[in-house]
Amino acid sequence: MLIHICCSVDNLYFLKKAKEAFAGEKIVGFFYNPNIHPYSEYLLRLEDVKRTCEMLGIELLEGDYELEKFLDKAKGKELLGEKSERCFECFDLRLEASALKAFELGEEKFTTTLLTSPKKDPNQLIAKGQSIAQRHNLEFVVFRNDNFEHFKSELDLNLQALARENELYRQNYCGCQFALKIQKESQNRSPFELYSPLKRQILPASIEERTQVFRTLDMAKKDANKPFLAQKTIATYRLLNGGVWLSKNSNPLNCCILARSKSKAKVRINDLRWVFSQRLSVLVGYSQRDETLFLTLEGLNTLMAKNYDNLKELNLNPLNYEEELSLRALVSGSESINPIIVLEERTEKTLFVEIKSVFQEEKVFYLL
């Protein structure tokens, strides 16, 4: 039997039940989920599914990541919610590919762990799966036999507990970018998962940080003193865009905006003064009318023991996020959110500053 797999949280419990129900029969897992976005999230879920399949001794095959096929299916349905026609089209894409893979492998049966998802309508899935199975002369397995509702009820109680016990990645959205946007909008929150960093950094509460956590956990799983997976809530930050201009219509100057710099409408700073800070032993630019602070690249090099030649080099090989927070703490305090901007060199000219940023609470995984 081939089992289409969507994620580890659904996967572990479902595969255990499948192995019990079909004892002695070979089970093949198939990870085909072109709806998952961004690609880094897809890879994170794939890595975790590999872990659960290894735990159970089940072979796992990976399908192609065909995002364009999903986007074609979702066209015109982007604004629909969960359990809508968009989800039905997504089922069609994934279950059709699963049926074709089962047929290719010579399997007679297939099913999907999506049946256990609390975000999906099992009746929609069953109808679609049976329709596709009939076209390919296959059987779509539902674990019914008058016990599917019991199976689903039991799963709802135990799914998250089993995931926590086995330290699996528990994603906070179904997978597609459209569902994520709708979910975040309903919570009045920004979809951080869809934001790419303006600098080459691994940011708190990012998919890249989650990947690091679970890879570290996986590498240490055989250690006697292995760390424990836990969650916490943090107040984190994203810089969306920003810059410094000599006039409203000029090209932006090379600059580096430090982490936790709050949003600024395009403010005009015409009283910029540079003073030598005895406390910091570097030049600092400030205005009596605005709280934005300026450092020169030379000042950054001094404070952070770096040797950047120019701002292009800094932006290509930036300070990591923690270093930026350390620099902020040195200059204006760890709790500060006033803009701090690094310029190539000191300037006495009038400057226009604009910053768009977001502060938001996020629940993150970490290791104890």
Swiss-Prot record:
Q: Where is the signal peptide?
A: none
The protein's annotated catalytic reaction(s) are: epoxyqueuosine(34) in tRNA + AH2 = queuosine(34) in tRNA + A + H2O
The alphabetized list of GO BP terms reads: queuosine biosynthetic process; tRNA modification
The UniProt keywords, alphabetically, are:
4Fe-4S, Disulfide bond, Iron, Iron-sulfur, Metal-binding, Oxidoreductase, Queuosine biosynthesis, Redox-active center, tRNA processing
Disulfide bridge partners, by residue number = C174-C176
Q: What class of enzyme is it?
A: oxidoreductase
Matching entries from InterPro entries are given as: QueH
**Protein's pathway:** tRNA modification; tRNA-queuosine biosynthesis
Name the Enzyme Commission number(s) assigned to this protein.
Answer: 1.17.99.6
Q: Where does [4Fe-4S] cluster bind?
A: C6, C7, C87, C90
Q: Name one GO molecular function term.
A: 4 iron, 4 sulfur cluster binding
Which function does this protein serve?
Answer: Catalyzes the conversion of epoxyqueuosine (oQ) to queuosine (Q), which is a hypermodified base found in the wobble positions of tRNA(Asp), tRNA(Asn), tRNA(His) and tRNA(Tyr).
| Similarity comment text for this entry | Belongs to the QueH family.
What is the official name of this protein in its record?
Answer: Epoxyqueuosine reductase QueH
Biological source species? Helicobacter pylori (strain ATCC 700392 / 26695) (Campylobacter pylori)
Q: Read off the lineage from the record.
A: Bacteria, Pseudomonadati, Campylobacterota, Epsilonproteobacteria, Campylobacterales
Give the gene symbol. queH
